[in-house]
Every structure is written in C-alpha cells, then in structure tokens.
Design a protein with these regions (language model features):
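Glycine-rich beta-alpha loop elements in corrinoid/cobalamin-binding modules
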Residues: 1-43
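Radical SAM [4Fe-4S] cluster-binding motif and immediate context
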Residues: 53-225
C-alpha cells in the first residue's frame, strides 16, 4: 500500500525514475532489478480507511445481494472491508507463497530454507515486523470502520474479506465483544472468511461470532488436521 501510494504520486507528478521507491521490481533493459525492500506495515492502525466516496456506490449497492446467508441475500446496502494483512498459514498452493515475507527474504535476506535456517529479512528486524506474516489492526479500529460506514452510507451488511479471521481467536473475540457493545450487531449483519482447522480446535468461536451478527463463514478446507 505504501509503495503504491508513492508510485502514484511519482507518476502523477510526471516523474519517470522510480528507483528511489522501495518495494518495486523494475525493467532494466532485457532484464529486471529490485529497488530497496519495503518493510511490512507493523502498525495497521495507521492505515486510513478506504475512500469509499470515490466509488459509484449506487451501482455497488445495486448488486448487494449474495447467496451466502439469508441476511446476505436480503442485503441492499452491502460494503466490504479488509483489516488483516497476510495469513498465518503456509498452504503450498496459495498466492501468499508468491508474495509473502518469506519469498521476499529469498531475494533480500539471509538463511537457507533447505538447511532449516530461519528465513528473515534484515529490513523486518529493523522495522519491528520480524516473523510477522499475518498482522491485524486493533479490534476497535475495525469496529470504528463499520460505525463510519453505517453513519455515512447506512449499510445493512458488510463482508470482512480478511484472509482468515478465525485464525486469530483473541482478535476475533475482541472484535465480536466490541461489536456487540456498539449496538451494531442487530442492524448491520456480516460474514467473513476462515479456515476449518481453527474452528475445529476452537468451536466456541462460532457461537461468539453468531451472537455478534455473523451470518456466514466462507470456509477453506485446506486441511482437516
């Protein structure tokens, strides 16, 4: 996100030299080269909420209905949110294995996966994101996001399209408790994504989420362990 913002500003100002922007892969004749690595964003509370006002929301709301649950099907003013960055799982087929911290380490860092050495980018050590492929803002940040969408756009449903909400039990419990306290759980229902093993190990999370207005979980059955 930070790389894209800097790249946009550079293009908008008419610049054509992007080598000072961290986190890019640039063409170099018939080959390519990397600019300096960019650390993962360690404090996601610093990320501003999306500029929903730049979207044609009347058109977006027209297609709110989705057949995932009764409330999702009946929704007329649905919007999507995303708070999590990354995923704690390491599924071999997933796109995260092509854009994760570990892959960037193989370009920039030190350590040999085959020898069992830790795969660490020095830049992550320096910026407090060491071994943190999955990160979340505070649960209050997420609840405040929904409050804003309700007040500004009168939404009746939201999709939390985080990679894997159920994988972080504490965060999900905190979010659900705060969401209940906010009074939004009756007027703004929601759904999200999760993995089956997390729920198999902690089945109580389903009831907590349901009580807080969650009407569906789109499960990934990557493993039954």
């Amino acid at each position: 996100e930070e790389t894209f913002a800097e790249l946009y500003d550079a293009v908008d100002s008419g610049k054509s030299d992007f080598e000072n922007i961290n986190g890019l892969c640039l063409r170099d004749g018939s080959s390519f080269k990397y600019t300096n690595p960019r650390a993962l964003i360690s404090d996601l509370n610093t990320v501003p909420y999306p500029a929903y006002d730049l979207l044609e929301l009347d058109i977006y709301f027209r297609y709110s209905t989705i057949p995932y649950s009764v409330d999702a099907y009946n929704s007329r003013r649905r919007l999507s949110t995303v708070w999590e960055r990354g995923c704690p799982r390491g599924c071999t087929f997933c796109s995260h294995n092509g854009m994760s911290r570990i892959d960037l380490q193989n370009i920039y860092g030190s350590g040999d996966r085959k020898l069992g050495e830790k795969l660490v980018r020095e830049v992550d050590k320096e910026n407090d994101t060491f071994q943190a492929p999955a990160r979340w803002p505070t649960a209050q940040y997420a609840v405040d996001n929904i409050k804003l969408l309700k007040e500004k756009y009168n939404i009746d449903f939201f999709m939390a399209v985080d990679e894997n909400m159920t994988s972080n039990l504490k965060w999900t419990k905190d979010f659900c408790n705060l969401y209940l306290d906010s009074g939004l759980s009756e007027t703004v229902k929601w759904g999200t994504l999760g993995d089956a093993p997390s729920v198999a190990v902690h089945p109580e999370i389903i009831k907590i989420m349901k009580n807080a207005g969650c009407t569906y979980i789109s499960f990934g059955f990557e493993s039954a362990s």
